[in-house]
């Protein structure tokens, strides 16, 4: 399986870089995983609704340019479906079983995802109703993808 994670902004925190690198190393036994960073749009702290939409649209265009046409796209969105780790694992396994070998996860910037990106996505998932920094979500996502492969194969890790 080829998994691509398209995300807005550069990862700055060393501890997150190290954690993600560790899970990418572990995942290499199961899938080819690549992370594609697109630049975030610089914006002032306080934005009008129109300005927020404009920022999301610009970031969204950058995201869409990185998604392969034949990819199954999963957007991480606060209004997405919440799943258990077992459900997430089963869903990833089904994608592989039904020939969806290219999966792209999308993590938006601090304002979220544009409507165009949400429309392009095949599904939306949420890791809960808490608001988490989008940089931290990268680590959470790669850990859950790793956990999913371990669950599907019945290997020890998931408790």
UniProtKB/Swiss-Prot annotation:
Entry binding sites for S-adenosyl-L-methionine: 76, 108, 127-132
GO MF annotation: an example: rRNA (pseudouridine-N3-)-methyltransferase activity
Subunit and interaction comment: Homodimer.
Keywords noted in UniProt: Cytoplasm, Methyltransferase, rRNA processing, S-adenosyl-L-methionine, Transferase
Entry-linked InterPro entries: Alpha/beta_knot_MTases, RlmH-like, tRNA_m1G_MTases_N
Signal peptide feature range: none
HAMAP family in the record: 23SrRNA_methyltr_H
Location (main, coarse): cytoplasm
Family: Belongs to the RNA methyltransferase RlmH family.
The protein's enzyme class: transferase
Catalytic activity: pseudouridine(1915) in 23S rRNA + S-adenosyl-L-methionine = N(3)-methylpseudouridine(1915) in 23S rRNA + S-adenosyl-L-homocysteine + H(+)
Protein EC: 2.1.1.177
Function per UniProt: Specifically methylates the pseudouridine at position 1915 (m3Psi1915) in 23S rRNA.
Superkingdom of this protein's organism: Bacteria
Protein name: Ribosomal RNA large subunit methyltransferase H
Organism: Listeria monocytogenes serotype 4b (strain CLIP80459)
Gene3D superfamilies cross-referenced by the UniProt entry: 3.40.1280.10
CDD domains membership: RlmH-like (cd18081)
């Amino acid at each position: 399986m080829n998994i691509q994670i398209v995300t807005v902004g550069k990862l700055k925190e060393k501890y997150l870089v190290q954690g993600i690198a560790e899970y990418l190393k572990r995942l290499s036994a199961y899938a080819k995983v690549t992370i594609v960073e697109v630049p975030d749009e610089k914006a002032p702290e306080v934005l009008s609704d129109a300005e927020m939409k404009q920022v999301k649209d610009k970031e969204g265009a950058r995201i869409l340019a990185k998604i392969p046409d034949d990819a199954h796209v999963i957007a991480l969105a606060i209004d997405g479906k919440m799943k258990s780790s077992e459900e997430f694992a089963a869903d990833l396994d089904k994608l592989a079983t039904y020939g969806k070998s290219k999966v792209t996860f999308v993590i938006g910037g601090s304002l979220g995802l544009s409507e165009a990106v949400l429309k392009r996505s095949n599904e939306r998932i949420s890791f809960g109703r808490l608001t988490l920094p989008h940089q931290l979500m990268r680590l959470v996502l790669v850990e859950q993808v790793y956990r999913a492969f371990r669950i599907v194969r019945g290997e020890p890790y998931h408790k």
